[in-house]
Amino acid sequence: MIENIKKDAQERMGKCVDATKNQMAKVRTGRAHPSLLDSIQVSYYGTMTPLNQVANVGVEDSRTLSVTVFDRSAIQAVEKAIMSSDLGLNPMSAGATLRIPLPALTEERRKDFIKVVRAEAEGGRVAIRNVRRDAISEVKKLEKAKECTEDDVRRFEDDVQKFTDAHIKKVDEILAAKEIELMEV
């Protein structure tokens, strides 16, 4: 029973790290990356649809994204969705393809993005700690029901703390890498 709780906690902590990494990937750096546009929703035939379902997003060069729209009638909607996103991008239409030059980030904008990334990292750490708290409370319930001993609980707490520290360290490493990436000019 305790092993199942331990495995579940480890799995959930891993998912927290992955979610944090995905959130940080959406923060714009100086380089073009297709995941920048993942959060954009396009009004396609009256339905909000993710951009990657109505167009193919690629990298033309280090500062330019290209968006190839599958349905020519949706070009205007895709262009409007990209312009109205909070990414500060200005697409240029070239037939069925939109070219999106990424403007260089100002020092002030970089610092704002670093604040956002740090907040995401803190959110990830909090989520990992919540998983630890939940797992420990589950084992303490087992102890109250006399299904495990006090020593088992202590050992479990130590193990879960080690997992927690390891996963928080991963989040910190991801944060450090993202900060370095953001500060590159």
Swiss-Prot record:
Compartments (UniProt record): Cytoplasm
GO BP annotations, alphabetical order: cytoplasmic translational termination
GO annotation, cellular component aspect: cytosol
Primary site of residence: cytoplasm
GO molecular function annotation: ribosomal large subunit binding
Keywords assigned by UniProt, alphabetized: Cytoplasm, Protein biosynthesis
UniProt xrefs under CDD domains: RRF (cd00520)
Family: Belongs to the RRF family.
Role played: Responsible for the release of ribosomes from messenger RNA at the termination of protein biosynthesis. May increase the efficiency of translation by recycling ribosomes from one round of translation to another.
PANTHER family: MITOCHONDRIAL RIBOSOME RECYCLING FACTOR PSEUDO 1 (PTHR20982:SF3), RIBOSOME RECYCLING FACTOR (PTHR20982)
Protein name: Ribosome-recycling factor
Gene: frr
